[in-house]
Amino acid sequence: MFLKTGDKVRVITGKDKGQEGTIKKTFAKENRVIVEGVNKIKKHQKPSNMNPNGGIIDTEAPINASNVMLLDPSTNEPTRVGFEVVDGKKVRVAKKSGKQID
């Protein structure tokens, strides 16, 4: 997967199109990511020791990784991601600007 936790991304399709956020968690096997503040759902929580009152809580649901694009760190615009080998290490590169991402 070309996305990592902490990356700034923009949603490019779906009901949250145009929203930006950082990736909180990635699920590589399912090709899904959780983006902060995007794809909010309401979850009905039963009372438990951690939450004695229970109730309805807002949380983010995972979205498909193909529905988000990484933001180029230099231009803050969505870009595709490529890979290059530099000094024997594989690094991510922004296709628009050609700059290294990590």
Swiss-Prot record:
Which UniProt key words apply to this protein? Ribonucleoprotein, Ribosomal protein, RNA-binding, rRNA-binding
Gene Ontology cellular component annotations, sorted alphabetically: ribonucleoprotein complex; ribosome
Kindly list the biological process annotations in GO that this record carries.
translation
Q: Name one GO molecular function term.
A: structural constituent of ribosome
Annotated coiled-coil segments of the chain: none
Question: Per its UniProt record, what Pfam families does this chain match?
Answer: KOW, ribosomal_L24
Cross-referenced InterPro entries:
KOW (IPR005824), Rib_uL2_dom2 (IPR014722), Ribosomal_uL24 (IPR003256), Ribosomal_uL24_CS (IPR005825), Ribosomal_uL24_KOW (IPR041988), Translation_prot_SH3-like_sf (IPR008991)
Organism domain of life: Bacteria
UniProt subunit comment: Part of the 50S ribosomal subunit.
Write out the similarity annotation: Belongs to the universal ribosomal protein uL24 family.
Known NCBIfam families for this protein?
rplX_bact (TIGR01079)
Q: What does this protein do?
A: One of two assembly initiator proteins, it binds directly to the 5'-end of the 23S rRNA, where it nucleates assembly of the 50S subunit.
Q: What is this protein called?
A: Large ribosomal subunit protein uL24
Gene designation? rplX
